[in-house]
């Protein structure tokens, strides 16, 4: 039972981590393209997701803070 739960949790966490990375890539791509409006919008959607992942323990809170600080 423990192994099954572990595997299920691992897959769930992997999908969440992937989603977080995707949002970060969208922000970076918007900044690189020079489109300020798109960059601001992408950052606004990525920010609460980073906070949520930090709260749930998927990423460290300092890592979330570092990403937000560097992207803002």
UniProtKB/Swiss-Prot annotation:
Q: Which InterPro entries match?
A: Ribosomal_bS20 (IPR002583), Ribosomal_bS20_sf (IPR036510)
Q: Where does the signal peptide begin and end?
A: none
Q: Which terms are listed as keywords in the entry?
A: Ribonucleoprotein, Ribosomal protein, RNA-binding, rRNA-binding
Q: Which GO terms describe its biological process?
A: translation
Q: Please give the Gene3D superfamilies that the UniProt record associates with this protein.
A: Ribosomal protein S20
A single MF term (Gene Ontology): small ribosomal subunit rRNA binding
- A Pfam family the protein falls into: Ribosomal_S20p
Its cellular-component GO annotations read: cytosol; small ribosomal subunit
Q: Known PANTHER family for this protein?
A: 30S RIBOSOMAL PROTEIN S20, SMALL RIBOSOMAL SUBUNIT PROTEIN BS20C
As for what it does, the entry says: Binds directly to 16S ribosomal RNA.
Family named by the database record: Belongs to the bacterial ribosomal protein bS20 family.
NCBIfam families linked to this entry: S20 (TIGR00029)
What is this protein identified as?
Small ribosomal subunit protein bS20
Species assigned in the record: Aeromonas salmonicida
């Amino acid at each position: 039972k423990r192994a099954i739960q572990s595997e299920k949790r691992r897959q769930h966490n992997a999908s969440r981590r992937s989603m977080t990375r995707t949002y970060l890539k969208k922000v970076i791509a918007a900044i690189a393209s020079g489109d300020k409006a798109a960059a601001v919008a992408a950052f606004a959607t990525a920010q609460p997701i980073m906070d949520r992942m930090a709260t749930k323990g998927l990423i460290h809170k300092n890592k979330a803070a570092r990403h937000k600080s560097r992207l803002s």
